[in-house]
């Protein structure tokens, strides 16, 4: 796994981790301590640039159906819903019962959603202040 950090002064305010294989780049985590300040967008732009450098044709992220803010963010930066894995969380819960039944905003958790972004050369729509590679 590799990733990027976003700093404000001495504070780490964001982290994106990813894995690259022959299929492209999978974003594993994207976290920000400050919402609405462009941190997620900045980190995602860094990931897109890295994917381009490594010859990836796509980036994808998998999330659960209750993560409405995650789904919204990724669609705003150009990702498209590519696949819904129906009932996969229910199946996982049978093995790991501590997986919650209900998530964000009271939405029942049942499915995984795969969102994907096709990488286009030199597409710079998010704006980046630069992040530290980790």
Residue ranges with predicted function:
Residues 1-35, 41-45, 118-119:
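Acetyl-CoA-dependent GNAT
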Residues 1-3, 109-114:
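Short hydrophobic/aromatic beta-strand or adjacent loop that forms the aromatic wall/cage
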Residues 41, 65-104:
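Conserved active-site alpha-helix within GNAT-family acetyltransferase domains
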Residues 38, 55, 78:
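Short glycine-rich hinge loops at helix-strand junctions in the catalytic core
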Residues 51-65, 73:
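Conserved GNAT acetyl-CoA-binding A-motif
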Residues 119-134:
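Generic C-terminal helix-cap and adjacent flexible tail
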Residues 35, 44-52, 75:
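A conserved short alpha-helix in the GNAT/GCN5 acetyltransferase fold that borders
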């Amino acid at each position: 796994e590799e990733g990027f950090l976003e700093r404000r002064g001495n504070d780490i305010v964001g982290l994106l981790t990813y894995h690259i294989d022959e299929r492209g780049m999978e974003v594993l985590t994207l976290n920000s301590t400050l919402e609405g300040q462009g941190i997620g967008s900045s980190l995602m732009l860094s990931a897109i640039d890295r994917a381009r450098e490594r010859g990836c044709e796509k980036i994808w992220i998998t999330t659960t159906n209750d993560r409405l803010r995650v789904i919204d963010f990724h669609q705003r930066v150009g990702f498209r819903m590519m696949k819904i894995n129906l009932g996969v969380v229910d199946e996982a819960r049978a093995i790991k019962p501590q997986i919650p039944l209900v998530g964000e905003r009271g939405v029942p958790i049942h499915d995984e959603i795969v969102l994907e972004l096709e990488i286009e050369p030199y597409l710079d729509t998010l704006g980046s202040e630069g992040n530290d590679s980790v």
